[in-house]
């Protein structure tokens, strides 16, 4: 089954690089015991994984590179990895509030945020709901609302069930890390129910955000090209930059790249991300 094959590829790790042992802990936020890791030192950047993912299978390799010059705060969101699920909607708004509370717990007043897939939606929500806590945002293969996906991806989502994941690497990873290893079927049902809801972040709200955003996509990542353009346009894109100052936000579309293989293009993406995060505001 093609859908199952796709899901199995989600755990293909990125390039591994040597990393020093991080500081780890559990933060009491909004009824959760949220697991987090802190790597390196410097300006803080928060990493937000995709649905069904963990720190390890989403960010291996990335953390080693980013933590060379930054304080990397990697988290596991509600129900994922070492963070147990609770009786609460898994919505981008709730997850963004959890991230903001974690920053308070760590006494980090402001940070950059990088999110992949589901984590990209959470990253945008952080900028919408907690603007004072977010400096810049990197959104990797994510959407402003559900209908930003191509029809093929939306159709595939409707056919997923807990049974689809039985015996998969996703289930193995869950049982290895979760404090409730026998709850995987219920977690899958909870997350799929959340994914079926029209979680629209709001075009006007995104446009009103002050944090510059870098939208990174593959040309075959399942997000409609017109939706990608819409998000970039809302953040000041689509101008003639030789005639007036460019937007502080950016857009990159990588050729021959899918939703999954984007995370394997670390050697291309990380330098662009570092350049974006390090960039000074343009002179007007």
Model-found features: residue ranges?
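Active-site nucleophile elbow and catalytic-triad environment of alpha/beta-hydrolase enzymes
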Residues: 189-205
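Flexible "cap/lid" loop of the alpha/beta hydrolase fold
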Residues: 121-129, 135-172
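Short beta-strand/loop motif that positions the catalytic acidic residue
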Residues: 209, 215-217
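Conserved alpha/beta-hydrolase "acid-adjacent" motif
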Residues: 222-230, 262
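Alpha/beta-hydrolase fold catalytic core
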Residues: 2-46, 69-70, 278-284
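Catalytic active-site module of serine/aspartate enzymes centered on a nucleophile-bearing elbow/loop
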Residues: 242, 247-284
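Active-site loop/oxyanion-hole signature of alpha/beta-hydrolase fold enzymes
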Residues: 67, 74-114, 254
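Conserved HGGG/HGGXW glycine-rich cap/lid loop of the alpha/beta-hydrolase fold
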Residues: 32-84
């Amino acid at each position: 089954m093609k859908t199952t094959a796709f899901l199995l590829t989600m755990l293909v790790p990125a390039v591994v690089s040597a990393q020093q042992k991080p500081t780890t802990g559990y933060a009491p936020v909004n009824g959760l015991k949220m697991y987090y890791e802190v790597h390196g030192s410097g300006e803080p950047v928060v990493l937000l994984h995709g649905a069904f993912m963990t720190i390890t299978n989403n960010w291996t390799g990335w953390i080693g590179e980013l933590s060379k010059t930054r304080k990397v705060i990697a988290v596991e969101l509600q129900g994922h990895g070492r963070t147990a699920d609770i009786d609460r909607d898994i919505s981008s708004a709730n997850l963004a509030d959890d991230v903001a509370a974690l920053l308070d717990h760590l006494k980090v007043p402001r940070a950059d945020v990088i999110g992949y897939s589901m984590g990209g939606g959470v990253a945008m929500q952080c900028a919408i709901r907690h603007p004072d806590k977010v400096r810049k945002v990197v959104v990797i293969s994510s959407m402003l609302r559900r209908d930003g996906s191509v029809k093929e991806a939306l159709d595939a989502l409707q056919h997923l069930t807990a049974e689809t994941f039985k015996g998969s690497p996703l289930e193995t990873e869950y049982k290895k890390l979760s404090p409730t290893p026998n709850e995987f079927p219920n977690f899958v049902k909870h997350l799929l129910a959340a994914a079926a809801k029209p979680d629209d972040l709001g075009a006007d709200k995104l446009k009103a955000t002050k944090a510059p955003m870098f939208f990174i996509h593959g040309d075959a990542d399942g997000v409609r090209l017109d939706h990608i353009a819409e998000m970039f346009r809302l953040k000041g894109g689509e101008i003639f930059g030789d005639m007036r100052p460019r937007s502080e936000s950016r857009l990159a579309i990588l050729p021959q790249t899918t939703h999954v293989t984007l995370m394997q293009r670390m050697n291309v993406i990380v330098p662009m991300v570092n350049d974006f995060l390090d960039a000074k505001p343009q002179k007007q």
